């Protein structure tokens, strides 16, 4: 399905699930919306932390259509999260009634973009096979501070067979705007993850820990995690795993 048709299914509420595996070859994006007074500091945070926050588009104040998609960012994601004063308020399927003229929207690259390349090279992705939202975890890996924005990186995890890991690294390092190569391979406790079966975002997956190794990529949910520390009066984001599918091909 073309991204435009897929986004229409989100807008009409026909589909509100994860976007993993959808619209092969097209960039998917994490989204953060903040009041203008926070926008410069957040932009600086992203520039200082390109591994977890690779910016692919920034919309001007009040604008709702990005350059990289013929879309309305208020309706064309399957699910959104609304945070108020550092707390999750609710999950919704559109944000039209929450929109403000002073909102600035940031679109950040997503690791879903490189998943097709992994599959084409014979690497199984268990979260897709098990129809789960990819598991994501808070870590002890610090991000570089920018103004009020500071905190630790969030990572996504894919459990791979040992012989697949080198291949996965070489494939994903080409996707710089989609988090690139892994930030950690192996023991999750080394990056502050105490329970691999209990992710902070997304859903757990089942895998044989004797036969598969957890591989972790920087994740665009990092800004949501950091935003909780800043506690803006309102912050809107994609629900983890529920991205904006853009019209931009991954090769560009």
From Swiss-Prot:
Keywords: Lyase. It comes from the Bacteria. The keyword Lyase applies. Its EC number is 4.2.1.-. SUPFAM superfamilies: PSTPO5379-like. Pfam families: D-Glu_cyclase (PF07286). The keyword Lyase applies. InterPro entries: D-Glu_cyclase, Putative_hydro-lyase, UPF0317. One of its GO terms (molecular function) is lyase activity. Belongs to the D-glutamate cyclase family. HAMAP family: Hydro_lyase. This is Putative hydro-lyase OB3382. It comes from Oceanobacillus iheyensis (strain DSM 14371 / CIP 107618 / JCM 11309 / KCTC 3954 / HTE831).
